């Protein structure tokens, strides 16, 4: 089976418009989460949102001003993420273009009596692909909050099946009234900055971001970074439309399968980048899963305290930050965690610390019972 590598990546978030600025902000403990007015005639919510003015300035730095009105706010975020990668890697007729998103241009629906074409995820993917000159039909991965992790898996499996030689994966979602209203109806949104795994956690903060990665089976010798995608799995727990299996069955099976394919034991995993939404049931289910897999002593964090829950972007964005941790031999703390609030022990990272990181486990879970896991190895 071909070995698959991630050799390049980028991200656009409230903490910065490239990986370097994001990493610097994380080392300084900065968070994008703040109070923002999202819904008219409703109190502000704690969300992680990109400043509109800064986004416009950044877009005009890299793209012709005549193009400004041709793209939605989310599309501009996608273009900014992808542009550096497309400039560094050649697109061929054997290159896949994979889009991960949960809601795409859902904001286009507001105040519309008919369905705008741009709201279709396939149309969004095609528009982005056409702009950069991709020659293959785009692939859309939209499976709730595991979409970003699954997009990496899809790229890996498609290349190993010899359907493509390489792939550009881009993932993203934006803060919208639609999404905020939906999560609020579940009473899942926290009334303060989120505290994954903490005793006093009371819900999620939503966020927005885009992230992009280049994945190939033929890395060049001079790549600045190189991570093998060693194993992957996605299992549905078939429990409930909005609640995970209380015993973590779906996530357990996903982690077990991914580690088996990677031929990695619990002792070999150096770091877990977990989903950690700060909801009561998700965090508890993860703690049970990691203990079932004998991973309770592995250093673990959730990035939700920095970025909020970025939906379709979260899995890819958090994988990128995990790889940066490995490159810089630095573990980032799980922000806002103070006191253990799950029934089983976890090794929650509490402060910046040096560590040799070779094997990374990245997990995600979401509505509809979906779960996904990948194992990455520093090459």
Model-derived segments and spans:
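Extreme N-terminal starter segment of soluble prokaryotic enzymes
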Residues: 1-7, 358-359, 371, 378-379
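Condensing-enzyme catalytic core mediating Claisen C-C bond formation in acyl metabolism
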Residues: 2-12, 19-47, 51-52, 193-262, ...
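Conserved small-residue
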Residues: 8, 26, 82, 97, ...
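Conserved active-site "lid/cap" helical segment
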Residues: 15, 20-100, 106, 254-266, ...
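Conserved catalytic cysteine-centered active-site region
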Residues: 35-76, 104-154, 179-206, 221, ...
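Structural signature of cysteine-dependent C-C bond-forming condensing enzymes
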Residues: 87-98, 126-137, 160-167, 189-198, ...
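Alpha-helical metal-binding/catalytic segments enriched in His/Glu/Asp
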Residues: 152-156, 210-218, 316-323
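Short glycine/threonine-rich loop-to-helix capping motif typified by GTGT followed
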Residues: 241-247, 277-294, 312-317, 351
């Amino acid at each position: 089976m071909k070995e698959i590598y991630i050799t390049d990546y980028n991200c656009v978030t409230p903490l910065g418009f490239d990986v370097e600025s994001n990493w610097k902000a994380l080392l300084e403990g900065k968070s994008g989460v703040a109070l923002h007015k999202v819904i008219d005639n409703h109190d502000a919510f704690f969300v992680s949102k990109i400043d509109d003015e800064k986004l416009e300035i950044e877009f005009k730095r890299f793209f012709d001003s005549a193009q400004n009105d041709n793209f939605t706010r989310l599309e501009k975020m996608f273009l900014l993420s992808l542009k550096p990668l497309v400039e560094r890697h050649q697109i061929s007729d054997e290159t896949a273009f994979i889009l991960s998103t949960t809601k795409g241009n859902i904001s286009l629906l507001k105040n519309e009596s008919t369905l705008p074409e741009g709201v279709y995820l396939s149309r969004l993917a095609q528009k982005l692909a056409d702009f950069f000159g991709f020659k293959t039909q785009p692939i859309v991965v939209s499976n709730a909050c595991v979409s970003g992790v699954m997009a990496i898996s899809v790229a890996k499996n498609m290349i190993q099946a010899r359907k493509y030689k390489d792939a550009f994966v881009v993932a993203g979602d934006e803060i919208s009234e639609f999404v905020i209203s939906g999560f609020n109806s579940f009473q899942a949104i926290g009334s303060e900055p989120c505290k994954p795994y903490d005793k006093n956690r009371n819900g999620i903060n939503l966020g927005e971001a885009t992230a992009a990665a280049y994945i190939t089976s033929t890395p060049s010798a001079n790549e600045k970074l190189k991570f093998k995608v060693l194993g992957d799995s996605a299992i549905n727990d078939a429990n409930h439309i909005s609640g995970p299996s209380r015993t973590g069955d779906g996530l357990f099976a996903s982690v077990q399968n991914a580690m088996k394919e990677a031929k990695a034991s619990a002792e070999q995993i150096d770091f877990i980048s977990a989903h950690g939404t700060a909801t009561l049931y998700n965090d508890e289910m993860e703690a049970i899963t990691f203990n079932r897999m004998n991973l309770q002593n592995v250093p673990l964090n959730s990035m939700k305290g920095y970025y909020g829950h970025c939906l379709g972007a979260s899995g890819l964005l958090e994988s990128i930050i995990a790889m940066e941790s490995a490159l810089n031999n630095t573990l980032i703390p799980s922000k806002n965690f103070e006191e253990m609030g799950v029934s089983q022990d976890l090794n929650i990272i509490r402060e910046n610390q040096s560590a040799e990181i070779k094997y990374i486990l990245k997990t995600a879970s979401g509505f509809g019972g979906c779960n996904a896991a990948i194992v990455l190895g520093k090459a």
